[in-house]
Amino acid sequence: MAAREQAALESRHREAADGGDPGAASQLGALLLRRGELEDAEPYLRAAAAAGQRAAANNLGVLLHQRGHRAEAAQWWRQAAVAGSAPAAHALGLQLRDQGEEEAAEYWLHFAAEQGHPLGAYALGDLMEHRRDVRAERWFRAAADAGHREAAYRLARMREAAGDKETAETWYRTAAARSHARAALRLGVLLEERGDHDEAARWYRQSAQNGEARAACALGFLLRDAGEQSAAAEWWQEAAEAGDGNAANALGALYAGRGEAAEAEQWYRVAMEAGDQNGAFNLGLLCAGLGREAQAEQWYRRAAYAGHREACNALAVVLLQRGDESGAEPWFSKAAESGSVDGAFNLGVLHAGRGEQQQAHEWYARAAAEGHGEAALQLAVAQEQRGQLSAALDRYRQAAAGGSAEGAFRLASLLDRRGDADAEAEHWYAVAADAGHRRAQVRMGVRAAERGALEIAESWYRRAAEAGSRSAAFNLGLLLARQDSETEAVLWYTRAADAGHGRAALRLALLSLRRGEPVQAESWCQRATEYGPAEVAERASRLLGALSAELSA
């Protein structure tokens, strides 16, 4: 309505109201109330309300409530509500709820809701949900159907909590389409969980543009996973500057991964200042990586005292490494009791080191139940030592599935010894070998050689030998010797012998003899005698005796 028309309408209302028209007084009072002219509005509203105008009684209640006259406001709202005003019933219900009079509040909110008042239906649903009343969903639905976006969001949350994601998605879409930022965020989460990343990104972006920092953070992670690190950093920075600690931590981790420690530290501090104790913990990790151990301990301690369970574990590790076992144990306990899987495992290690096997077993079992591969490995080793082979196999499988290369190797070895699951044994040897387990690499080499796959065998032996396995170096030497590559074979025999491999030393002694180098042969014999095992030492000793006699003749 144009300003001139508005002024003319107000003039007509004022003239009629001053002439005693209660309807005009009600409309004029409402107009003045909307403009914030409370002093001018009040007499018109009072006159109209006294004449039985229920809209005026409701608006008079609003005016008095704004001025802090809550008791008188309630009186006028009650009068209007009794006369059938749904807005007044809603307002009265809210005030009664805030005063703790929930039974009376429910009555008036129900009155408003039954008349189709969406705010009344929403407030009634809110009251019922607070009391865990299942009828809350009905009233949220009524409000949502009438266009109330917060009700649609709350209804979606209820359906999601009940496991009905399909209905939840429908209501999230309804609320998000009305620019509800949190609904757009939750819709994005649901879509991301089922792999619809493009649509999830659209809703995250809409939510972020409507001021939801968590959506900007989530969008950053989605972009990072798609390889768009620069775009991810922009959204994380926007979220971090809006106070999202998770985004600040992500930004810190991004810079830390690039080796930009100063920038990483800056954002970790922003996270900490936002109340996210991951910031303090990450500062500890950053300082530890830079060799600033004292500072690392301070940050771990700060995060640990704030209840960060992994910081408790990290602090305990620092204390244990410097010999303070009594100081470490309470922090391991706090970490474990708070749900840190590593804390539970480390507490098990601590008890095992003292010979307290029962306590160690309990903590290993707790960590293993949460998927800790090394904890499952410790349990499996103990079971195998007790002869509980079936149970040990199950635990080794759990350890291997949890990422333990040693668990995978031991599982394969046990299956190998049983001889009834060769394919599975091969699989787990391969898993361990691919993870860099040297003995598994040697076994893969041996198995390949046994089936005549010499190139594959050589590849596995080389990987293990180059990683420091003396058995692999010896086996590689044998393989090369059979392929007439004696010069390289000698290099690997020497590497194995220098690492204490008796058979390699004996092989070098025999090669030295064949070359007419008795002094060198004697030296290798002495080392083979020293290194063993027994049968090698015995052969080397006999050869050494013959060499000594020859050299002294």
Could you tell me what each predicted segment is?
Residues 114, 369, 498, 513-535:
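TPR/TPR-like (Sel1-like) alpha-helical repeat modules
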